């Protein structure tokens, strides 16, 4: 569906290309240059952004468009950091922002520099209109891909105080998500004792112990939460490390686990099931030593589909994009909604340009028209949610 844009197409494409060309890779966490670029873009448009250091090399940038205070604020949120480009070859180099056949390629083009740039442009479009009843806040945060330190800093700095709703511009292909699974990352470690590979009976093989432990972990029921619409718990075994060579009995083995928990299943329930798996494995292989190290935890969050922000998003998807859809409850990926919207609960919607299945892959891209349409969607959403100020 064609949309009459309220901004210059060339400027929008330039902004996104400039942003993708900055390698804000996390790890190691080097996104301050991206935050500084966004701050300059906001200053160029007449705003007074705040740049906040989160850690060396990491920073948030925020800006606020003041309303009259008659209504709660709306928070636009996105993250600056991107995952590493990986070892697989790219046809389009990851930090050159090449444009081909209506697509802009690069690491972060979908996840989520297109959503972030679209929110900045929408912020500017709204500012050029009349005064609104509530504040519009733009927030670009650090460290979403690892630990959510940037979003946590927004909360600790009280930027979410007085916010009535949050819009997170992750790549969803304009599907509207209203819930997010919790995230529980664990590292399991089995500790044995080393020996020469020709005399394995003189040692204890930590990899063999881990094999028995993983069999019990994989038997943990992947449960639904109280509302089946949010799906089941999922488990991914992400990494396994152990041993130094075929002629040495390994004395250490480490495995990383990624559990995603639907709303209503607390971390502690899962942890007890993991501890039970350890006990079962130990009963089969007496003397097994296991250490459990939680590494990352994010709570599950959900917004009622009847909430005003959800209904406005769905209405605008119909009007602007010709998409008739209901809200989708839970994406497969994690976002900063768990940090921003859990305590206290704040309604949120996750919606943005770009396809989620392209995130973290070689030759990631965004359709330029989708990116441009997102600007108009976000701008109109802000105008309708906040509403025009009451005349004096």
Task: Give the role of each language-model region.
Residues 1-2, 7, 53, 178, ...:
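Metal-dependent amide/peptide-bond hydrolase catalytic core
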Residues 2-107, 128-132, 345, 355:
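Acidic/His- and Gly-rich active-site-bordering loop/insert found
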Residues 19, 23, 170, 210, ...:
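Residue-level signal for inorganic ion chemistry
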Residues 45, 128-132, 159-161, 280-287, ...:
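Short helix-capping segments at alpha-helix termini
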Residues 55-60, 172-173, 333-334:
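Short acidic loop-to-helix transition motifs that present clustered carboxylates
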Residues 101-104, 109-110, 114-219, 360-373:
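Fold-level recognition of mixed alpha/beta catalytic cores in primary-metabolism enzymes, strongest
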């Amino acid at each position: 569906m064609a949309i009459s844009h309220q901004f210059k197409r060339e400027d929008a494409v330039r902004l996104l290309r400039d942003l993708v060309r900055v390698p804000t890779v996390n790890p190691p966490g080097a996104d301050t240059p991206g935050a500084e670029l966004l701050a300059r873009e906001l200053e160029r448009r007449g705003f007074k952004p705040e740049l906040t250091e989160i850690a060396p090399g990491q920073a948030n940038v925020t800006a606020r468009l003041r309303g009259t205070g008659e209504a709660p604020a709306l928070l636009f949120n996105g993250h600056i950091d991107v995952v590493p480009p990986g070892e697989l070859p790219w046809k389009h180099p990851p930090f050159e922002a090449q444009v081909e056949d209506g697509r802009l390629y690069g690491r972060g083009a979908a996840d989520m520099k297109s959503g972030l740039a679209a929110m900045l442009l929408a912020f500017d479009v709204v500012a050029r209109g009349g005064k609104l009843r509530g504040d519009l806040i733009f927030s670009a945060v650090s460290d979403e891909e690892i630990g959510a330190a940037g979003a946590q800093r927004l909360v600790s700095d009280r930027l979410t105080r007085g916010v009535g709703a949050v819009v997170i511009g992750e790549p969803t292909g304009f599907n509207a998500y209203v819930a997010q699974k919790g995230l529980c990352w664990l590292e399991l470690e089995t500790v044995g004792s080393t020996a020469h590979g020709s005399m394995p009976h003189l040692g204890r093989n930590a990899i063999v112990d881990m094999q028995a432990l993983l069999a019990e972990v994989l038997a943990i029921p992947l449960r639904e939460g109280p509302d089946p619409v949010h799906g089941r718990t999922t488990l991914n075994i992400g990494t396994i490390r152990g041993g130094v060579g075929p002629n040495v009995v390994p004395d250490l083995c480490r495995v990383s686990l990624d559990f995603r928990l639907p709303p209503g299943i607390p971390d502690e329930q899962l942890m007890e099931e993991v501890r039970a798996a350890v006990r079962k494995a130990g009963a089969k292989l007496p003397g097994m030593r296991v250490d459990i190290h939680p590494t990352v935890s994010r709570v599950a969050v959900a917004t009622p589909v009847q909430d005003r922000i959800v209904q406005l998003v769905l209405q605008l998807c119909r009007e602007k994009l010709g998409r008739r859809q209901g809200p989708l409850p839970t994406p497969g990926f994690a976002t900063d909604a768990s940090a921003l919207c859990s305590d206290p609960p704040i309604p949120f919607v996750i919606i943005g340009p770009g396809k989620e299945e392209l995130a973290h892959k070689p030759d990631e891209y965004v359709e330029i028209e989708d990116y441009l349409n997102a600007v108009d969607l976000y701008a109109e959403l802000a105008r309708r949610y906040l509403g025009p100020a009451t005349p004096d």
